[in-house]
Amino acid sequence: MNIKNKLSPAVIKTSLQGTTKEEVIRELLEVLVEAQLVTDRETVYEALMERERKMSTGLQHGVAIPHAKTTAVKSLVACIGLKPEGVDFAALDGLPSRIFIMTLSPIDRVGPHVQFLAEVSMVIRTEEARERLLQSKNAQDVLSVFGL
């Protein structure tokens, strides 16, 4: 999988407004709906929240990767949202999440989701890359961190 096939300015939001996990998830989902990548908003929201109930997708270093499998997408879709002040996402390290990468994949496919997350992880593994993301003023700044 090539990350550049999944990321574009249409799926990047550099100033999330949500202040709770639920609000951030809804806001990111709306980005995908507006980009016409999701066919059923509520089905996807329920799938995302069910995943969060099983185990938080808040990782470490201010990164959260809300994700779900759903019938509402035909192939893997993704979006990126930033909130420099952070939101409590019940992260593994207890710190607020500030970088959000949402992925949705079809129920019957595993590979693309894992490949996409591996590629993203390679980019955001350094503090320098995460700081560059958080300082992004627009979608093109975000894409440049990913080499796009």
Predicted regions and their residues:
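Cytosolic covalent-transfer regions centered on His/Cys nucleophiles
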Residues: 1-148
